[in-house]
C-alpha cells in the first residue's frame, strides 16, 4: 500500500475515500483561492517552475536537495497518481459533479485549446472554473457518460490519473499522453516527481500471449519488451506505472494487474 493510502485512506485506496472529495475538505486551507490562482496563473507558474528545476536539478551539489524539496512541495499542493480504468470507474461512482474541459497541459505544450481530456470532480466548482480560459467549452456529464468517454480514452492509450489540490482533496481526473507536462517533467526529463505509480503492476501470461506487440506500442513508459527468441512480450516491473492501458489492446487478455505492494522494492 502506498504512503498516500496510509496517510489519507486509513490503509485503503485513498482515492476511493469519499471524504477526499467532500465539501468540508474543499472549504478548508484556502482551497477555493488556491484553485482560482491555479487556473489564472497555470502557464506562468509552470513555465517558471520548469525553467528553475531545469537550471538547478542537474547541479552536482544542490541538485538532489532541490529535487527532494520540489517533490515535498508537490505532495503538499498538487500531485497525481495513476489509476487503472476499473478503479477510475469506482471513483466516478462517488461523484455528484463531473465536468469535462480542455487540457491545460496540451494547450501549453501543443497549442491545442480544444483537447478536452480532463475532468473536474468533487465539489461543484462551476463558479471557480467559469474564470478559466475556454470555459464555454466545459461539458457537465452524468456518471455513465463520463465512464463511456473514459473507456474510449483507455482504448486510445491515454493513461488515467487523479490529482490533488492541496492534498488530500482530489479535484481532477487527467487522461494523459506524452504531451502532458507531468510526463515531460518526470518521465522524459526526470526533473522531479509529480505523479506516482498506480497501486498495481502489469504481468504477462506467456501461455496466452501471441507476441502481436500491440501492447508494446501502447505503453508510454517503455516498460514492455519483446523477445524475438521467445516471440512473447514481458513487462519490466521496475518501469511499469500500473496504468493498465496495455490491456485494452490485448486480444488474448494476456495482461493482468497485480498489487504493487506484493513486489518487494518496486518504485512508487
Regions found by a protein language model. Give the residues of each.
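Iron-sulfur (Fe-S) cluster-binding modules
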Residues: 1-156, 225, 234, 253-268
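Ferredoxin-like iron-sulfur electron-transfer modules
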Residues: 161-168, 172, 189-218, 222-242, ...
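Conserved adenosyl
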Residues: 132-137, 145-157, 161, 175-183, ...
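Local cysteine-cluster metal-coordination motifs and their immediate loop/turn environment
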Residues: 3-4, 101-112, 170-183, 207-221, ...
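Short, Lys/Arg-enriched charge-dense amphipathic segments
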Residues: 123-129, 181-195, 249-259
Amino acid at each position: 500500500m502506498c504512503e498516500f493510502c496510509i496517510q489519507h485512506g486509513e490503509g485503503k485506496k485513498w482515492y476511493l475515500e469519499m471524504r477526499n472529495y467532500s465539501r468540508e475538505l474543499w472549504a478548508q486551507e484556502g482551497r477555493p483561492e488556491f484553485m482560482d490562482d491555479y487556473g489564472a496563473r497555470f502557464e506562468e507558474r509552470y513555465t517558471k517552475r520548469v525553467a528553475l528545476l531545469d537550471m538547478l536539478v542537474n547541479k552536482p551539489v544542490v541538485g538532489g536537495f532541490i529535487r527532494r524539496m520540489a517533490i515535498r512541495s508537490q505532495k503538499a499542493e498538487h500531485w497525481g497518481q495513476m489509476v487503472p480504468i476499473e478503479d477510475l470507474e469506482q471513483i466516478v461512482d462517488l461523484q455528484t459533479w463531473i465536468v469535462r474541459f480542455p487540457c491545460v497541459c496540451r494547450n501549453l505544450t501543443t497549442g491545442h485549446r480544444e483537447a478536452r481530456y480532463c475532468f473536474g470532480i468533487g465539489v461543484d466548482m462551476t463558479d471557480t472554473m467559469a474564470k478559466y480560459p475556454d470555459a464555454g467549452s466545459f461539458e457537465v456529464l452524468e456518471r455513465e457518460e463520463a465512464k463511456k468517454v473514459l473507456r474510449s480514452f483507455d482504448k486510445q492509450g491515454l493513461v488515467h490519473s487523479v490529482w490533488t489540490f492541496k492534498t488530500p482533496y482530489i479535484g481532477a481526473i487527467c487522461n494523459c499522453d506524452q504531451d502532458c507536462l507531468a510526463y515531460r517533467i518526470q518521465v522524459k526529463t526526470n526533473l522531479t516527481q509529480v505523479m506516482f505509480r498506480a497501486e498495481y503492476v502489469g504481468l504477462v501470461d506467456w501461455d496466452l500471449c501471441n507476441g502481436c506487440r500491440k501492447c508494446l506500442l501502447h505503453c508510454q513508459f517503455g516498460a514492455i519488451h519483446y523477445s524475438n527468441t521467445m516471440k512473447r512480450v514481458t513487462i519490466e516491473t521496475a518501469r511499469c506505472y500500473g496504468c493498465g492501458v496495455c490491456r485494452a489492446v490485448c486480444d488474448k487478455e494476456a495482461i493482468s494487474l497485480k498489487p504493487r505492494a506484493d513486489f518487494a522494492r518496486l518504485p512508487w
